[in-house]
């Protein structure tokens, strides 16, 4: 497995292999030392052109727990601020003997561009509105761990579908396992082509009723200057997960969110604290999944053919 650029190009068997290995990695996380030599001698670099807490820290911990040499580049203090191009930046990292680059960028397709122009492995940590493959993988891992399967489930994805790379990766991944996927959100935030891949519900009540999993998405407030929603208060009233809407959701239905959470906008604090809320579990599972991805990307034999 040379790269992980997206779930669209992975097979069902590829995903299962990653999830199975992540289960083994989680056993390591539960040990007292949380340490394995699998990446000893490897150089792992994180290059984030967008802000991140969970993904960046999770990747860095995953690499360190596997004994890699890790470096985190702050774009704000790098030569990017002097006008250095993306290509020159990654070519510099190649000359510095990087083995794995974990990259996040606001422009879709950047990880694919880097993979075509450099010799090291590339892991996509989020590219524009395209994909966020490791977030979807950790979501799938969490679902399988809680429910025992990721096949033939009824899954709702609620919120800002239009801008969400998390939604796209989850749809690409979950659709390979014969799941019924429903989406719902403001009409301005539902892509016109989404009906080819998921059922579009007409109300929040319809969207969440009878579901095994509800994935709530972050409203990307940094994009709201374009007027996709009228106000945060109105969004919460019609699309937020609160105590009233929980009447339509079973106590066994998983409530998921990729984070960061805008409390009182997408979801209430009370719902976040329910036993069927998996948000903290998702963060922990993210380390195990990213350990698995790093392991596979540094092995000559792999799942990419």
Curated annotation (Swiss-Prot):
GO terms for molecular function: amino acid binding; aspartate carbamoyltransferase activity. It is an enzyme of class 2 (transferase). NCBIfam families: asp_carb_tr, PRK00856.1. This is Aspartate carbamoyltransferase catalytic subunit. GO terms for biological process: 'de novo' pyrimidine nucleobase biosynthetic process; 'de novo' UMP biosynthetic process; amino acid metabolic process. Its EC number is 2.1.3.2. It holds the Pfam family OTCace_N. Catalyzes the condensation of carbamoyl phosphate and aspartate to form carbamoyl aspartate and inorganic phosphate, the committed step in the de novo pyrimidine nucleotide biosynthesis pathway. Heterododecamer (2C3:3R2) of six catalytic PyrB chains organized as two trimers (C3), and six regulatory PyrI chains organized as three dimers (R2). GO terms for cellular component: cytosol. Keywords: Pyrimidine biosynthesis, Transferase. L-aspartate binds at residues 82, 165, 218. InterPro entries: Asp/Orn_carbamoyltranf_P-bd, Asp/Orn_carbamoylTrfase, Asp/Orn_carbamoylTrfase_sf, Asp_carbamoyltransf, Asp_carbamoyltransf_Asp/Orn-bd. It comes from Caldicellulosiruptor bescii (strain ATCC BAA-1888 / DSM 6725 / KCTC 15123 / Z-1320). Pathway: Pyrimidine metabolism; UMP biosynthesis via de novo pathway; (S)-dihydroorotate from bicarbonate: step 2/3. The keyword S-adenosyl-L-methionine does not apply. It catalyses: carbamoyl phosphate + L-aspartate = N-carbamoyl-L-aspartate + phosphate + H(+). Carbamoyl phosphate binds at residues 54-55, 104, 132, 135, 259-260. Belongs to the aspartate/ornithine carbamoyltransferase superfamily. ATCase family.
